[in-house]
Amino acid sequence: MIRAAIEQLPASLIREVANAGLGRTDVLPFWFGESDEVTPEPIRAAAAESLARGETFYSHNLGLPELREAIAAYATALHRPVAASRIAVTSAGVNALMLAMQMLLGAGDEVVAVVPVWPNLTAQPAILGARVTRVPLAPDDQGAWRLDLPALLARVTPATRVLLVNAPNNPTGWTLG
């Protein structure tokens, strides 16, 4: 039997949009964060070379050590020292976000989310038994999206474990600042 938290999740509206646009040449496929461009040749060639070398087995759990070292060096150069041991490479962004949610949230914890937002960001906490409180963006007089910061802060409680602020925001394009 499927858990109630899963059964009660709303159907994905993004999937509805994608289904309506799939196969249409006059529509750009932005619904899944995809480009309308084919993957560049150097990346396709590197993938083919990797397959030809027989690199088809499971990798290290946290990602290839040399990739984690490169990411750590890049992050260190941008910000502050980051050890490769603190880096985990995932197969996709949604996997990384779910791992983060699993590390931070338990049943009864609270998430305060700026909405509208990509539906997976609010579905993940719900799957884990956390409560999601939504704080809406609203258009100002010029039609630009704005966040009511006092309203956001008023929603934070001692049970709040995660503050979800997606910027640049999907789907509005709103940015912090």
Which residues does each predicted region cover?
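N-terminal small-domain helix-loop-helix segment of the aminotransferase-like
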Residues: E7-A92, L99
